[in-house]
Amino acid sequence: MPTIQQLIRHERQTLKAKTKSPALRACPERRGVCTRVYTSTPKKPNSALRKVARVRLTSGFEVTAYIGGIGHNLQEHSVVLIRGGRVKDLPGVRYHIIRGTLDTAGVKDRRQSRSKYGAKAPKE
């Protein structure tokens, strides 16, 4: 605990909030190129093969991004758009790949929450 005299000499410094998605550099999205597309297993107690990609961004960072939805068409050298948002059961995955933009196709036969997966409206 500082004395009043110490506080007069040096005022308290405000804590700066640390960003949860530093690779975006204060942008809503960033473009990048997939360097590796693979599956990863989640932390306990969950069990699955989650689809993830290693992406080299235009900001110079190389990050791991999650590929949401059922099925995808991504491979090495695919150009993708990523957004922030972590995956709770995959350590180190702090970004999501946006479906339906650039080289990423939307999810086929998706009827609900279509805007999140880049799916077009179904033909009546």
From Swiss-Prot:
Keywords for this protein: Methylation, Ribonucleoprotein, Ribosomal protein, RNA-binding, rRNA-binding, tRNA-binding
SUPFAM superfamilies on file: Nucleic acid-binding proteins
Domain of life: Bacteria
Region ranges (Disordered): 104-124
GO cellular-component term (any): small ribosomal subunit
A Pfam cross-reference name: Ribosom_S12_S23
Endoplasmic reticulum recorded as keyword: no
Modified residues (3-methylthioaspartic acid): D89
Gene Ontology terms describing biological process: translation
One Gene Ontology molecular-function label: structural constituent of ribosome
HAMAP family, per database record: Ribosomal_uS12_B (MF_00403_B)
Assembly and interaction partners: Part of the 30S ribosomal subunit. Contacts proteins S8 and S17. May interact with IF1 in the 30S initiation complex.
Protein function: With S4 and S5 plays an important role in translational accuracy.
Family membership noted in the UniProt record: Belongs to the universal ribosomal protein uS12 family.
Listed name of the protein: Small ribosomal subunit protein uS12
Taxonomic source organism: Synechococcus sp. (strain CC9311)
Gene name of the encoded protein: rpsL
